Amino acid sequence: MAGTKEIRTKIKSVQNTRKITKAMEMVAASKMRRAQERMRSARPYAEKIRNVAAHMAQANPEYQHPFMVKRDVKRAGLIVVTTDKGLCGGLNTNVLRAVTNQLRDLQNKGVESQATAIGSKGMQFLGRIGAKVVSNVVHLGDTPHLEKLIGAIKVQLDAFTAGEIDAVYLAYTRFINTMRQEPVVEQLLPLTADKLTQTAAEKQAYSWDYIYEPDAQTVVDELLIRYVEALVYQAVAENMASEQSARMVAMKAASDNAKNVIGELQLVYNKTRQAAITKELSEIVGGAAAV
């Protein structure tokens, strides 16, 4: 059994670790609230663009934007959204497992793939498995800006428009609530009809005609590009909210485990100290009896 000095050192070490995990838990909780607000504030923008784009697309049925052209999938692009940092539980592991399954399915169908990595963890993973990475963006910080994402996203959008790839998929972690996050792989392009179909209420709200400047086609082109960019930004915002939630939960679990370990070590320390005192008393009593 270890001596009391070694046990005291171990207790001190675990206490110091617990201070770190507790501080990280509090920081993650603060960042989580801001990330959730950012995620919620991004939703109305994407929804408003979708409504306007849907109205204009239905008002001009003779024009079909390249993003809406459906082709047989022989080549595909995959945008992978992960975190830049670790210590967030199984968040990255789960979404990268979904990415692996998607890549395997594409490979089994004879579909070539190219990837865009958003986040260091995804970039490292794609490099390890030998995936073809055509663009990436890392170190977004706690406040992602669309300007930083556009360059990496544009590579995939341009490839789809040029017919170099026939579909684009988006992999990220969807935020459900603080305790639950869900890895998803969604089709980003071509845009499906249900994404640009208006409900009866939306048709009522957007029943007017527009005056286009310079022309309807140019406006629809720009709107759909902004809409797809907004979808990717929303995915990044949800991924960041998921990251901070997962990190807060992971650090809380680490702090609770450290507390339990400290309690167990304290018990061992007390038993060891008691055994040492009992031994000393026995030696004293034995020595006195011998005299």
Swiss-Prot record:
GO CC aspect terms: plasma membrane; proton-transporting ATP synthase complex
Entry's localization field: Cell inner membrane
A Pfam family it matches: ATP-synt
UniProt keyword list: ATP synthesis, Cell inner membrane, Cell membrane, CF(1), Hydrogen ion transport, Ion transport, Membrane, Transport
Keyword Transport: yes
Membrane topology qualifier: Peripheral membrane protein
Organism superkingdom: Bacteria
Listed GO MF terms: ATP binding; proton-transporting ATP synthase activity, rotational mechanism
UniProt keyword annotation of Transport present: yes
GO process annotations (BP): proton motive force-driven plasma membrane ATP synthesis
NCBIfam families, alphabetized: ATPsyn_F1gamma (TIGR01146), PRK05621.1-1 (NF004144)
Its job: Produces ATP from ADP in the presence of a proton gradient across the membrane. The gamma chain is believed to be important in regulating ATPase activity and the flow of protons through the CF(0) complex.
Similarity-based family: Belongs to the ATPase gamma chain family.
Complex and partners: F-type ATPases have 2 components, CF(1) - the catalytic core - and CF(0) - the membrane proton channel. CF(1) has five subunits: alpha(3), beta(3), gamma(1), delta(1), epsilon(1). CF(0) has three main subunits: a, b and c.
Name recorded for this polypeptide: ATP synthase gamma chain
Species per Swiss-Prot/TrEMBL record: Ralstonia nicotianae (strain ATCC BAA-1114 / GMI1000)
Gene: atpG
